[in-house]
UniProtKB/Swiss-Prot annotation:
Entry protein name: Disease resistance protein RPS6
Gene from which the chain derives: RPS6
InterPro entries named among the record's database cross-references: Apaf_helical (IPR042197), Disease_R_plants (IPR044974), Leu-rich_rpt_3 (IPR011713), LRR_dom_sf (IPR032675), NB-ARC (IPR002182), P-loop_NTPase (IPR027417), TIR_dom (IPR000157), Toll_tir_struct_dom_sf (IPR035897)
Subunit description: Interacts with EDS1.
Chain ranges of the TIR domain: 12-176
PTM annotation (N-acetylmethionine): residues: 1
Amino acid sequence: MASSSSSSSRNWSYHVFPSFSGEDVRNTFLSHFLKELDRKLIISFKDNEIERSQSLDPELKHGIRNSRIAVVVFSKTYASSSWCLNELLEIVKCKKEFGQLVIPIFYNLDPSHVRKQTGDFGKIFEKTCRNKTVDEKIRWKEALTDVANILGYHIVTWDNEASMIEEIANDILGKMNISPSNDFEDLVGIEDHITKMSSLLHLESEEVRMVGIWGPSGIGKTTISRALFSRLSCQFQSSVFIDKVFISKSMEVYSGANLVDYNMKLHLQRAFLAEIFDKKDIKIHVGAMEKMVKHRKALIVIDDLDDQDVLDALAGQTQWFGSGSRIIVVTENKHFLRANRIDHIYKVCLPSNALALEMFCRSAFKKNSPPDDFLELSSEVALRAGNLPLGLNVLGSNLRGINKGYWIDMLPRLQGLDGKIGKTLRVSYDGLNNRKDEAIFRHIACIFNGEKVSDIKLLLANSNLDVNIGLKNLVDRSLICERFNTLEMHSLLQELGKEIVRTESNQPGEREFLVDLKDICDVLEHNTGTKKVLGITLDIDETDELHIHESSFKGMHNLLFLKIYTKKLDQKKKVRWHLPERFDYLPSRLRLLRFDRYPSKCLPSNFHPENLVKLQMQQSKLEKLWDGVHSLAGLRNMDLRGSRNLKEIPDLSMATNLETLKLSSCSSLVELPSSIQYLNKLNDLDMSYCDHLETIPSGVNLKSLDRLNLSGCSRLKSFLDIPTNISWLDIGQTADIPSNLRLQNLDELILCERVQLRTPLMTMLSPTLTRLTFSNNPSFVEVPSSIQNLYQLEHLEIMNCRNLVTLPTGINLDSLISLDLSHCSQLKTFPDISTNISDLNLSYTAIEEVPLSIEKLSLLCYLDMNGCSNLLCVSPNISKLKHLERADFSDCVELTEASWNGSSSEMVKLLPADNFSTVKLNFINCFKLDLTALIQNQTFFMQLILTGEEVPSYFTHRTSGDSISLPHISVCQSFFSFRGCTVIDVDSFSTISVSFDIEVCCRFIDRFGNHFDSTDFPGYFITTKLGGHLVVFDCYFPFNEEFTTFLDGQFNYDHVDIQFRLTNDNSQLKLKGCGILLSEDVPSLDNRPCSPNILPGVCEDSALERRSFRTKMRMMRMRLLKKLLNR
């Protein structure tokens, strides 16, 4: 037998070759096993279901001989295949010749039966040996005995397959001597990055592959690349990590000018080869490098360098390196990757809110989650760091060990940049090396963050900034990103841009942009602005009053962008404007004029709007804009929504490029000017709720119009000619509809109230319609069967049509996913027009039963039957809907039968823990329903909200307060779970719904007085009813490592204190009682090995704890965002 040293010196193509009988394990055990190997970056040979024959395929023989380890999965039918047995012969041969390692797995099979060829395995083996030579049989028997004598894994000795598979994978890592370094194992989210990178690296391939890691500064690219290097380096013959430190050290002993210097290139290559071959004194010459590494399987990481000369010198061509080599290039510049034909690119994205908070907590508390009294503060800090890993880490380390009061004092200062964060991000800005790109960066940071890309390009046109190229460069360098045609810049990068502008001058009026409230107020009040100011952006929600000098803008004659805005148009905050009567000047160079709640009746008389591109003045007090005709060739967008005093629109005959005109809720407007006929490029016209509008000029045909909203124009007497190619139309509550209306390309149509249909509805509609809304029309009595011609219809809303009795039968709208028939009070039959509906609203209809056929709606997620006063029964087949998330039967006062047999709980076994969710059921005011029976029959993945004033006797532990203390309880599993019930009293005379979260806090106390606190958020609830509510839910608390550290290493505790809280600060809500039933007392859980909220077989899986933690964080963040927005 070959020595282990000769084995380890071979250049293996694969780490593992699996030998198995596909009939038994391919789609079960083996698929999970191979997935775990992939997750750990262990390269396995995959046969891709090669057609099997009697002789061993050459490809399989190559796979066996080039694998470091052979894993033999012995199963019941393994010996039925001469193919498997011949594989085994080759494996034994490789074991003897060059020390191939072999790991046997006995899958539902006694090892002795394999070793001695007895039992059912022996019988199958004897059958296979028929018509075979004696020599073949003997060699097979010897191979079976040889491998079965090796210490392996017997599945019956393990509690579950998952644990065994993980142990085998770790065993393989150990045998391969490729156990990953522990340096990065505690990094939050690193495993997810490595898993995603593994598919790009495609390690099983023999090709030489270059892979890029791309993302903005501070997002964790270097951390990910170092973790990969640590994990992978020992799988390669050579490995080297190249960063700026490596380059600077290589240049220290050289006096040349730069990398273009040929000698410098050789010197850099010499340093590189010294790392590759682990030798100090290497002498090279022209072309030596590619020859020296040509047969070397190498891992090369080039981090944070976008210097073309460095890449050319060290990895100029993939042909330089041996088969299987991987070159990873880490950069902020996507263009650099493209230019070097690196097509496999991993984009590093910001972590989720939950992961960001976990990152911060690791830095601040050295734990995964914050102490309860720091939860909200920690969430706010993470929010202000914008989820950027660098910011989270720096802020966490700075706040570690500091008292809560200091945290509170520090929060206002977190809007600025920490020195380390600022320096890191500044490198990205300085790396632009182009003044135009730098200028675009500052424009976005100060003015345009969150604006539409198309608007930004128009506003910066003619600016000599080469905006198209500049935006592409900023995207490539991860300084901005584009989502849904909206441009976004990270909050810390935005703060960097603002800080750069602040350093331009100590005098705010001498700066390029004004972005701070104090500076803006000072400049506008004291008239200190100069020609250097290009833009002003002010959120009026930040101030209560604003003084504007009559000559404030005269010194700023280069002002291009004036943005005085509010994000809270729905809130009527009053700002005291001090605008002098003689205020008569705005710079004529303005391209963007946004002035929400403008306080005057018209714009300054000396303002010339010829350069305007975008005019937005929502909720203004304007009565008119200006007099006369102006050249408005550049104007693309005019938005005057909510300007209720506006009486006239100026002459727009020269606004020939206007694309969007929004006049919604301009309730004093009586007519449109005849000049709109010249708006040949108008695409979007919104005149909704112009309730005094009477006429639209006749003969107007806006051929480019795509969206038209005339909803609520109740006095409209004449209609414009609607183009046939329009795609979106809302004519609800209008006085009339023209009889010649034909809508060939219509995608969405909204009709309601006083609409009089002069022609049958279906003749008006395009078969490509995807959404139809038809509401509040008492004359509508039936839906015609011809609706089936709308084969692309996805959303159908027929609401409050109180004389609608039936829907057509025998049709199936395949595309329909949402159906709303609410308040159709005469509708008695359950709809049967589509089997693909996911959202069904039948509230306040006359339906009497949920039929057996409900099971056909296999994709149903939401069912609303609130207020169905005739509803008598709900079919038990509803429990077969495996996607159902919420069902509301509140105020179904005649409902007597609602059976939930729990048969769908079998489905839950198949769901991943992270995707697992409860079914929320609402039975408030169902007075004839046996609520006690309903609670007792509740399956373990549901929540209930019911009517009630006290906790039912079903719950063995009850109290009229908000907390319960339990004495010592013996626990056999690594979790604590129970069914909880709270009595919530709603005292409100508002018609608005009341929502609330329930928080359950458990304090586990051991016999020494040590305690550990854990919190669960069982759900979010909503109600519109007064009085008492019973809320029933299931809670789950895992006993993780942190828990056992506190409680003497065992699942033992003296008692548990359980407190129920309402997290909402709402005086309308009171918690008046609570109760619990321990999980072992829940009938539906008798045979469950896990908690009510957890899947069988995975009760120790950390994913469950993460799921609970993410739920908690999501709810906390929602409340926090609401609080921040209301400031």
